[in-house]
Amino acid sequence: MISTRQAGELLDLTPHRIKQLLNENKNLNFEQRTNGNRQINIPSETMANLLRLRSKAVVPKKCVIKSQKGGVGGTTLTLMTAIRAAQRGAKVLVWDLDPESNATSFLMPEDFDYSQAATALEIFKNDEITLDKCVLKSRFDGVYLIPAKGVMRRVERQLIGENPKNLIRKKLKDLEGLDFTTIFFDLPPTFSRLSESAYITADICLLPTDASSFGIEGAMLTKEDIEESCEQFEADIPEIKVFLSRAHNQKRTSVKDSWEYLVREFGTSMLPIRIPERADVVNAINDGRSIYEGKCANDVKEAVDELVEIVAPIQDIRMIQ
């Protein structure tokens, strides 16, 4: 949920005017909730309705935030970006395609029987299991989940010889009635047939890297693999961007050198976004909360907001095709 001040910033209105709109329009599905400071909190669905009231909406996109290098924050940033996008009015789905299932562990509602969850293994093994029947409400407002399990490693046996261009694309047709605006694929740090399908199905791929040579090489390989797969299977190349994650002291010479190398190597694909390394983020994940609950450094929140502007931008409805 977001405050009236934050909603006002998105709609270019004052907090007072946001309160007026909430009181004047009973069809916004708003039930007043306040925190301990008596601040009004606006849920995701109400924020989406406010956007529509002002002839605005979230631009629909399918997204990946990952590269072929583990430990650079891909899953954490997927989760934080998904939660923030939902707060801003997006209806968000996170499809966990990583057998490690960290996104599932974080998002899974406490009262759900995990043993009954259908994952990509069952979805691709049995055509009678449609994707819409696998969607769960997560613990976070406006965020939904298709879960993963460790056994999902076996799914690759089902996909031998399959065209990755069509694997996920066909399954997504089952979701057309659910009106998701923003879909995230959380992937393992490998280029399997299923993750390949997710990369070339996405509208935008954001590749995080740290300042290490391994991280930079992972981003480079991921970009090359996506482009080669798109050429091989005659798929449109998604928008591919690279950004610096887990950035330590930016005054250090090694970080500056890495940044300059990234800019030279990736050119216009390099985003001017640096996600700072902060214990607040680790603590939030370990506590099962987002960085927008409780204490977290503002520079981290601001950097995540920049990612949200890319994967879930808000535009005039007339500009959205």
Predicted regions and their residues:
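P-loop NTP-binding core
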Residues: 3-5, 9-10, 15-16, 20-23, ...
